[in-house]
Amino acid sequence: MTVEYAAPMKFFSFWRSLASFRVRIALNLKGLPSDVIFVDLDANAHRTDAYRNVNPQMALPALVWDDGTTLFQSLAIIEYLDETHPSPPLLPADARGRARVRALALMVACEGHPLLTPRVRRYLDHELNLRDTQQQAWRRHWTVETLAAIEAHLAGDKATARFCHGDTPTLADICLVGHVHAAVTQQIDLAPYPTVKRIFETAMALPAFAKAHPLAQPDTPEAMRGKAG
């Protein structure tokens, strides 16, 4: 398949961004180089005019080519990469398999993760004046609810194997590991979710996943390095 954009990609990323984590995994699995531009969310670099010109939503990640073409939203970026660089495939060959993988991915990317993002936490803090303990309870509730739902789907489906769907990583695994990382950072016990835990550990043993880990990035704070697990 002909690649639409052969020029080097600029990848706007941040070490702690789970959406950026997903795209890093996909780039690694595909063996695709990119010019990484770090956007410090903690310093509100995503809210500057410079980044607003890249992505008016002021969210990460974004892929930009020299001709000005910009892609945003992690799942759209990953599907583009999969269509233009089909090996290894991140979606199954059959329509039902693709629908299942997308559904699992969407459970995380469109239902679980949005409730944990910095802009939601900022609203809970600045607009609703929730205490730290209340905000922690919020994050924990939605993280656990998503884990439980995914576990039920994975454990009850014969299509689940070494990974979420079959024996090779798919878009579903790319999304799953980020959500589990969010659970680990909250010290949530994964014992009630054995299928999720097994797949997470299997995926993170692969170099493409391990090298994409939030705690293993060039912009990861030095104090956080080496804590990836």
Predicted feature residues:
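GST-like domain detector, emphasizing the conserved glutathione-binding G-site
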Residues: M1-Q134
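Conserved beta-strand edge residues that scaffold enzyme active sites
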Residues: L41-D42, K197, Q217
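Generic structural signal for helix capping and beta-alpha/helix-loop junctions
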Residues: N44, F200, T220-P221
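Acidic/histidine-enriched, glycine/proline-rich intrinsically disordered or flexible terminal extensions
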Residues: A216-G229
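GST-like fold's C-terminal all-alpha helical module
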Residues: G112-A205
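Phosphate-coordinating loops and pocket residues in cytosolic domains that bind phosphorylated ligands
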Residues: N53, A205, P214
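Active-site-flanking alpha-helical
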Residues: D82, H179-V180, H213
